[in-house]
Amino acid sequence: ELAAFEGKDEALVFSTGFSVNAGVLSVVVGRGDYVICDDRDHASIVDGRRLSFATQLRYKHNDMEDLERVLQRLPQEAVKLIVVDGVFSMEGDLANLPAIVELKHKYNCSIMVDEAHGLGVFGRQGRGVCDYFGLTDEVDLIMGTFSKSLASIGGFIAGDKDTINYLRHTCRTYIFSASNAPAATAAALEALHILEQEPERLEQLWKVTNYALKRFREEGFEIGDTESPIIPLYVRDIEKTFVVTKLAYEAGVFINPVIPPACAPQDTLVRFALMATHTEEQVERGVQALTKIFKAQGIIK
């Protein structure tokens, strides 16, 4: 069902999303190959590429000119894999997948997209960023997790039949790790059915997301280039990030502090993440509480 949902031949299920990236990348590329990553890719991608023994190259976040500069230096006939988050987990912005696909054809590359934060949010019935851009067939491997929109634990990789069969017999994090718990798998499967059968949930998610984006911008928050229900509220001070988180919790607002190593010291933020079950009234209460806190801390005027 996962493979069909993602528009691929087959899929493998892992016990965690982290183990998907760490395991898959360690075996789909190797010595003499090249793996090219956005410098804001998830830590599991970083660990996977290190384990692969391939030459690791990075480009500036969502900078397609820099990606092309990296690709221009590589042999045309070499194995080259571009690995990118579909939605970046801290910033909330999207990978420029149309431009990456153009470069794939120009420089003879393959593409792997991490849909951890795109699944259940973008595309038809929440199929992800690849579907949102209409580029599912151009992406060679699609990775996803059960721990975000599917409200469980686990992960998967979807692709063509031969590649998935190869991974089934070579991927160490799949072979030498316990299978996902039946209850967790069943919960994720039921969540997938809800995505397919209850489109009004996705509509509500985007309704409250667009409302929150508008209100935070009106109040003068720095939220960067987010295009998703992940809304970063930049603090740019480690100590104040913790203070804001504590004060927000006391005010009845749950936010996640993001500090090194998840970001650079000058880029600390709190992450305001939305669900389909939130209402505009709840969002407004959150915006008002955070506006008061951020102003008291001198973060916004």
What is each residue range found by the language model?
Residues 24-43:
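Conserved PLP-anchoring active-site segment centered on the Schiff-base-forming lysine
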Residues 1-23:
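Short loop-beta-helix segment that forms the pyridoxal 5′-phosphate
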Residues 4, 250-253, 262-301:
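PLP-dependent enzyme catalytic core of the Aspartate aminotransferase-like
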